Amino acid sequence: AVERPRQDGQVHEPPGRERKAGCKNFFWKTFTSC
């Protein structure tokens, strides 16, 4: 769950919290950018 596409990103992690700060969290956590 490190290098996942954005569509897979919201699957391995709860869309509730990652949805709000997802753009920022996903950016540095994974390589996904909103």
Curated annotation (Swiss-Prot):
Any one Gene Ontology molecular-function term assigned to this protein's record: hormone activity
Cysteine disulfide links: 23-34
GO annotations of cellular component type: extracellular space
Pfam families named among the record's database cross-references: Somatostatin
Main location: secreted
GO BP, sorted A to Z: regulation of cell migration
InterPro entries noted in UniProt: Somatostatin, Somatostatin/Cortistatin_C
Keywords noted in UniProt: Cleavage on pair of basic residues, Disulfide bond, Hormone, Secreted
Annotated stretches, region: Disordered: 1-20
TM region positions: none
Subcellular location: Secreted
Function field: Somatostatin inhibits the release of somatotropin.
Family membership: Belongs to the somatostatin family.
Stated name of the protein: Somatostatin
